[in-house]
C-alpha cells in the first residue's frame, strides 16, 4: 500500500532527475520591515543545498549617513521580533556590499529610480520588488522598467487601477509572461482571501464583514504627533486605534465573485507583529456546525490546494506570539469558530510581516518561472 501511496502523493517528482532551477536576478527596492524579511528568506534559500533559482543581487536605498551600510547590516542581522539572522553577515564598505552566508549583495544608493543602471553591476533581466509603497500605480512603477537590467516589477502593496493583485494560491494562475508589473496585494488580503475561498467553494458567501485586529506598523506614531490619517497620529503603543482597511474590498480582485459582498474595518493594537482577521459571513448553504466547518479547514491545511496559505490551530493556549514566523498566509483558530444557521464567524491569525513575505516570495517564484515542489502533489 505504501508503495502505491507515495508515488501518488509525490506526483511527477518520482523518478524525475530534475533540472537546475533557472537563475533569476532579484533586486529589492527598499529595505524596511518587508524588504529585510524578503532578504532573509532569499538568502536562507540561496545557502541551502537545493538553492532557489532566485538570486538576491542588490538592494536600492537612500543613503543615511556615513555608517549607513553598517547599520543596515545590523538591522538585517538583528530583529526584535523575528530574532537573529541564521548565519554570518559581513560588511564590505569599500564595495558597498553586505555578504550574508557567503552571498554578496550590492547596496545601491539612489533616491530616483530612473537614475540606476543595473547592468553596471552585472545585473540583467532582473525581477525588482518595490517594497517602499511610494508608487502603487503602473505609471509610477514603470520607472523601474526604464532602467537597464530590470525586466519585471512586483509591488508589495495593493496595486491601483487595472494592475493584477495576486494572492498566491488563489489567483496566481492569471500571471502571464506579458505581465511586467503585478501586485502581491496586502498582508490582510493575503490572510483572508484563502479562507474566504474555502468558505465560498464549500458553502457560497452571500455577504460578510471583515474586522482586522492589526499590529501597529511604522506608519503610526510612537507618541502623539501629527499624522495626515485620522486617529493614526495617536500613540501606537498606548492605544487601540480604529482605522480603515481596503483589504475586504480588495478580495474581489482575487475572487471576482465576491465583489460588493464584503465590508471591512481595522483596529490597530499595541503589539509589534501578528494580527487577526475576524470573518463574519452569511453563507448560501448552512455549514451545519462549527465542527463541520473546522473539519473543512483542517483538511485544507493538511492536503488541500491552499495548504500553504491556510493553517489550522486547535490549541486552547494559542496566543498571538505563537504565530510569529508562521509561513502560511493565515491560521484558522478553530476553537473560536462560531456557526449559527447560515452564519459563520471564523478567526484567522496571521503574521502580517513574515507570513506575508512568504506569500510575496511565492509570487516572485511564479514570475521567475520557478515553483518550489510541495507535497502532497496537486
PLM region spans:
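Short glycine-rich or small-residue beta-strand-to-loop segments that form or flank ligand, phosphate
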Residues: 23-30, 181-183, 277-284, 344-350
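NAD(P)-dependent Rossmann-like dehydrogenase/reductase catalytic/cofactor-binding core
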Residues: 1, 324-378
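C-terminal substrate-binding/catalytic lobe of Rossmann-fold NAD(P)-dependent oxidoreductases
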Residues: 49-117, 207, 212-344
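N-terminal Rossmann-like NAD(P) cofactor-binding subdomain of oxidoreductases
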Residues: 1-222, 227-230, 338, 360-363, ...
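A generic structural signal for alpha-helix starts
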Residues: 190, 285-288, 355
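Short phosphate-engaging motifs
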Residues: 136, 162, 247, 289, ...
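Short, well-ordered loop/turn and helix-capping segments at boundaries between secondary-structure elements
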Residues: 44, 201, 253, 257, ...
